[in-house]
């Protein structure tokens, strides 16, 4: 698994937009699969949470090298998906994350900062 990624979270579907939300899901799966096949991302996955009174309802995680992830989230494909999602779903969010060795390095830098205080 790659050490960098972006998480796209979302809440409930806006009333009356359920069909379009399903179409968006299908489109985003296609875009993500194509990005992996073309080497633009290493992998991706998605999780739906059990119903709750608070968001998020689910998350899609996109993994790759830092430059891959940055290029992908700047792409027109990704920006269009996020724009459509914002019109169809409540509480759409996009956040970068680190994992694996990058997580270890991040905590190492944090530890050095603490020691410098």
Briefly describe each language-model feature range.
Residues 1-56, 64-74, 96-117:
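Short S/T/G/P-rich N-terminal loop/turn motif that feeds into the first structured element of a domain
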Residues 80-98:
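Conserved short beta-strand edge segments in small beta-sheet-based binding/regulatory domains
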Residues 56-58, 88:
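Residues that flank catalytic or metal-binding motifs in active/ligand-binding sites
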